[in-house]
């Protein structure tokens, strides 16, 4: 009987943290880097039915010849004004192709650490991979993961 009571109690908490799937793809050339650190994206990510209308972040890198690690901190502003905060790590590897062109591939892991409004208790993990062309300042990425709202 004690075991049944423990299971009943723990199952209620599990339902309170329903997890949601996340997937986002930025086709090649839709993200641009500039001196003003503005980003243009084709398809906007969606969280709980709301689109991200702006993503501002800081990336601190330790690259040598385009390869190395970086830390990212981002504030995503949703279409209703709510915000989602993230912290991530990036590992980049730059190689030179047979045509002499430099190509940088990367993988990333991002933690959703909190938010405002309806996203105040958001938590989650996203994994991404993609490429960057530092000469043209373009990037493409595929990101997947899951998030939930803690009660």
Question: Where are the language model's segments positioned?
Answer:
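Beta-strand-enriched cores of mature, soluble protein domains
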Residues: 14-151
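Bacterial N-terminal signal peptides
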Residues: 1-10
